[in-house]
């Protein structure tokens, strides 16, 4: 347990140093996605952002060599039920086909063509969803603890502020 906490501390320090560094926003985002994928054992990381009118566009991706993630999709394709389900306060949405899931969770997994999915939406100042950061196909089947989900929520919140700046 001590080794895991030490590893997490090093990861968090490195992550926050990067976000506070002088690198380009694109480099910060790509390296952050890569590090989160590595640390939490996800095969894919991605960022979708809206054009403000009709579509969500795939802006960054890690591990999507098979091109299974949609390059774009209409906002209306992500139903209100999906959006509400993924908009859990103080924690990201997480579902895995290995878990006992609701039909809505399975529908979200099917929509993204993945076996497991972690997503945190981000909003503009008016509360409108302008994008989301996600990770898919986790190799580790150990469920996340509430503390881990809250940590990920905070990390992705910091990263989402960097992403929103470029809009």
Language-model features: where?
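Signal-transmission linkers at sensory-effector interfaces
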Residues: 1-27, 38, 165
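Regulatory loop-to-helix N-cap segments in sensory/regulatory domains
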Residues: 2-3, 137-154, 162-166
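Amphipathic alpha-helical regulatory segments at dimerization interfaces
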Residues: 17-21, 30-39, 84-85, 108, ...
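Helix-loop-beta substructure at the N-terminus of cytosolic sensory domains
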Residues: 21-59, 67-69
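Acidic/proline- and glycine-rich, intrinsically disordered low-complexity segments
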Residues: 67-93
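Signal-transducing coupling segments at domain and membrane junctions
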Residues: 92-116, 137-138
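A short, aliphatic-rich beta-strand micro-motif
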Residues: 115-124
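Sensory beta-strand/linker motifs that couple input domains to effectors
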Residues: 126-137, 161
